[in-house]
């Protein structure tokens, strides 16, 4: 069944909170990656202070120094991974609370005065188990950090073989739209945005199920953000209504809530919402 439904005031309030939380985590990630890129560049630029190395007069010594720099960068990037994970993990926990409490708030506005606590086992399930896009969050971020390490080391080696100055190498690694750090930052934002969205929609479903179990007559509805970049499948899903335990269906695919297809082409950067 598909109907046209106007998002109510309380649902809009919850969506605004979600948007503000997402913007906050993006700012935090940008700050972390920006500082790390500066730290790496500073380590590399230390070589430019050594006039005996600038013209590659001592190739053997320079190679040894290069390896030492790589080890120091490894330490900086491991710290980056820990900070990024901590920020995103906190954000995902907030997403679950927003989705669950926001659903209760909306149901009360619709004349269903229910109140029950969040089930912590459901939180663990949503944050640590049910990521269907690929591996767990920490493993994915660790792989991204390892890729960043390899990219930076490759740039270091390439700079040496090309006869570039250390300042030039540092600039290429730390800045620019195609720098390793810029690519890694964008990847971290996609992970945070996609996982945060999935967690919030799943917590909404958890709350809907709890309400249903306590006797509330609740149905769920898919609400798509309709504009020029909306996926055709999500446009088709817009307005579909299902029983709480029934999946939404489109193009041979099924999902219990937005962000739950398990297909990156459907889930990454999804902006759809689950309403009741």
Residue ranges with predicted function:
Residues 1-182:
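N-terminal leader/targeting and assembly helices and adjacent pre-domain segments
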Residues 183-276:
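Acidic, glycine-rich two-metal-ion catalytic cores of nucleic acid-processing enzymes
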């Amino acid at each position: 069944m598909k109907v046209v439904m106007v998002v109510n005031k309380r649902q809009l309030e919850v969506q605004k909170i979600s948007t503000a939380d997402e913007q906050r985590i993006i700012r935090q990630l940008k700050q972390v990656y920006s500082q790390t890129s500066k730290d790496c560049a500073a380590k590399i630029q230390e070589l430019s202070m050594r006039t005996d190395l600038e013209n590659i007069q001592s190739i053997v010594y320079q190679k040894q120094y290069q390896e030492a720099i790589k080890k120091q960068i490894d330490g900086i990037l491991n710290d980056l991974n820990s900070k990024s994970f901590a920020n995103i993990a906190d954000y995902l926990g907030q997403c679950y609370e927003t989705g669950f409490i926001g659903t209760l708030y909306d149901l009360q506005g619709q004349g269903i005065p229910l109140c029950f606590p969040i089930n912590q086992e459901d939180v663990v399930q949503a944050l640590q188990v049910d990521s269907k896009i690929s591996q767990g969050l920490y493993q994915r971020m660790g792989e991204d950090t390892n890729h960043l390490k390899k990219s930076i080391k490759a740039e270091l080696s390439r700079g040496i073989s090309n006869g570039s100055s250390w300042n030039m190498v540092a600039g290429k690694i730390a800045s620019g739209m195609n720098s390793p750090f810029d690519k890694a930052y964008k990847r971290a934002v996609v992970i945070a945005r996609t996982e945060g969205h999935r967690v919030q929609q799943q917590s909404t479903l958890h709350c809907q199920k709890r309400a249903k179990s306590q006797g509330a007559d609740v149905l769920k509805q898919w609400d798509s953000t309709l504009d020029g970049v909306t996926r055709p499948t999500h446009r088709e899903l817009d307005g579909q209504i299902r029983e709480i335990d029934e999946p939404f269906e489109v193009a041979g695919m099924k999902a219990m809530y937005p962000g739950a297809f398990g297909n990156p082409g459907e889930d990454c950067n999804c902006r759809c919402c689950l309403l009741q």
